[in-house]
């Protein structure tokens, strides 16, 4: 299908065939994908985020399933966000960490941590066999302005710092997009996933960016439910963004 402004400005969208759902093992899914050959992808990406799309590698997609509308695009309005008690405790628990924004380039230590994370947290989930090529293909876009937000335990007595987690983050003119976060499973008690989002919110504030996009919230999916703990949260209903409503957006 195509969305037309004028012929030279045509925005092409493709609908994929059905494929196994990445969230529910008993369901199939399909997506809408922006034309991956469109040279304007980098410029279109901020607008696509505002339409509920997401990036995976060089693909910009949005779920478009025939019989399921469980995936709800959500974002945090940075200016209105206030951490709750649990999130403040998480920030305090990780106050000893160094947070560094680095270039999105493949490194052996990053891949080793990514592989450990997938092996422990997503065993037999279809991603735990990723090699260095899949790591780069999945997380690093050729046209996106991507950065790695590294969370590190400082070194002492001449020892190097220890990499505990990485939040892959796209930087756009309208906000940050939290693409993927992985961390050392031995430090799961730190709540590094929550800490990463808190740091992305602070990053957006420093840059004067209005939103942090969290991808999709899915009712009843344990690994996605943490997103609604950030208040306020905005949800996209296919036409506009509005304050998240647990009953309404549960579809």
Swiss-Prot record:
Name of the gene encoding the protein in the UniProt record: bpt
Organism of provenance: Stenotrophomonas maltophilia (strain K279a)
First-listed, main subcellular location of the protein, grouped into a coarse class: cytoplasm
UniProt record, GO biological process: ubiquitin-dependent protein catabolic process via the N-end rule pathway
GO cellular component, one term: cytoplasm
Record carries keyword Acyltransferase: yes
Annotated localization: Cytoplasm
Record-given protein name: Aspartate/glutamate leucyltransferase
Keywords of the record: Acyltransferase, Cytoplasm, Transferase
Top-level EC class as recorded in UniProt: transferase
Keyword hit for Transferase: yes
């Amino acid at each position: 299908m195509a969305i037309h402004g004028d012929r030279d400005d045509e925005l092409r969208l493709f609908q994929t065939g059905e494929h196994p759902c990445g969230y529910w093992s008993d369901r199939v899914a399909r997506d809408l994908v922006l034309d991956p050959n469109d040279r304007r992808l980098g410029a279109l990406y901020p607008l696509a985020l505002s339409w509920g799309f997401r990036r995976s590698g060089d693909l910009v997609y949005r779920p478009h399933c025939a019989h399921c509308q469980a995936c709800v695009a959500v974002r945090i309005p940075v200016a209105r966000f206030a951490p709750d008690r649990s999130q403040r405790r998480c920030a305090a628990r990780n106050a000893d960490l160094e947070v560094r924004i680095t270039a999105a380039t493949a490194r052996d230590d990053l891949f080793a941590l990514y592989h450990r994370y997938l092996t422990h947290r997503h065993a037999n989930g279809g991603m735990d066999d990723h090699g260095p090529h899949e790591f780069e293909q999945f997380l690093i876009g050729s046209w996106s302005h991507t950065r790695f937000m590294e969370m590190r335990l400082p070194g002492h007595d001449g020892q190097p710092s220890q990499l505990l987690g990485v939040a892959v983050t796209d930087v756009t003119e309208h906000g940050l997009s939290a693409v993927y976060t992985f961390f050392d499973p031995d430090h799961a008690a730190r709540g590094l996933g929550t800490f990463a989002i808190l740091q992305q919110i602070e990053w957006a504030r420093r840059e004067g960016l209005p939103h942090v996009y969290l991808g999709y919230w899915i009712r009843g999916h344990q690994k996605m439910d943490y997103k609604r703990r950030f208040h306020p949260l905005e949800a996209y209903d296919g036409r506009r963004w509005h304050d998240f409503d647990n009953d309404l957006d549960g579809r």
